[in-house]
């Protein structure tokens, strides 16, 4: 099996290396990842500037490709020909932090995986809750990612489905099962912080308290709050079918 691996935290992220080592048990892994951090970069693509790809070495000495574009650029370039073969699976992660609920709209990790769906390749995004904290252990999340990837291939996951996987912190004894979930409700508490530079010109930071979410039963938030791995199947058809029907009853003409 040929696997394309990317992320949004950058090619030298410890989460990516841990995931690569596990996925190599399933097949050949090609890494094409951003050269810098693109967290919350969403599905941006570079259209009005050149993109460059350079070979780098990961911490274990293995080769990888670093791109100066976004996570979606990395996967897009790989699929357009930077890889010399079409992958069977696109995997993105392990993200240094959760991608739950509304996070999927902002997440570069999810966007990299979603780019695989654009060209009809089944994909998986993997995130470790609180993975940004010093000393985070990615081994449990990487092991779960390998198992989920193997199952996705065995079940012939459709090529228009992305599995958004969130793994809670904890040992294998604590994080010992998974739940299939729906997206929950993320609560953001963003605040605009305005400051002045030394020349008196304003600049802004987006700050505020850390976001949380509603741990409702059946949701990704509920699963990880109870030490379960959350597996949420996503696709990019965002059509609200109820309102297709309701809006169709309106009069849409120039009369």
From Swiss-Prot:
Record's cofactor remark: Binds 1 divalent metal cation per subunit.
Coiled coil: none
InterPro entries associated with the record: SurE (IPR030048), SurE-like_Pase/nucleotidase (IPR002828), SurE-like_sf (IPR036523)
Keyword Translocase appears in the UniProt entry: no
EC number: 3.1.3.5
Protein name per its UniProtKB record: 5'-nucleotidase SurE
Xref: Pfam families: SurE
Cofactor: a divalent metal cation
């Amino acid at each position: 099996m040929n696997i394309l691996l990317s992320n949004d935290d950058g090619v030298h992220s410890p989460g990516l290396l841990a995931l690569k080592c596990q996925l190599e048990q399933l097949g050949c892994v090609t890494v094409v990842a951003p050269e810098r951090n693109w967290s919350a970069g969403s599905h941006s693509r570079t259209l009005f500037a050149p993109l460059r790809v350079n070979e780098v070495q990961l911490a274990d000495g293995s080769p990888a490709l670093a791109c100066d574009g976004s996570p979606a650029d990395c996967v897009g370039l790989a699929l357009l020909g930077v890889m010399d073969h079409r992958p069977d699976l696109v995997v993105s992660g392990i993200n240094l932090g959760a991608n739950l609920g509304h996070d999927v709209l902002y997440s570069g990790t999810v966007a990299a995986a979603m780019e695989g769906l654009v060209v009809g390749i089944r994909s998986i995004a993997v995130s470790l809750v609180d993975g940004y904290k010093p000393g985070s252990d990615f081994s449990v999340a990487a092991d779960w990612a390998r198992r989920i990837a193997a199952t996705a291939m065995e079940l012939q996951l459709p090529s228009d489905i992305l599995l958004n996987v969130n793994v809670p912190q904890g040992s294998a004894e604590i994080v010992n099962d998974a739940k299939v979930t729906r997206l929950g409700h993320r609560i953001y508490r963003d605040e605009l912080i305005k400051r002045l530079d030394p020349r008196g010109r304003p600049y802004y930071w987006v700050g505020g308290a850390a976001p949380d979410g509603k741990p409702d039963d059946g949701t990704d938030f509920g699963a990880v709050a109870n030490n379960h791995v959350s597996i949420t199947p996503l696709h990019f058809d965002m059509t609200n079918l109820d309102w297709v029907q309701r809006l169709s009853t309106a009069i849409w003409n120039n009369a």
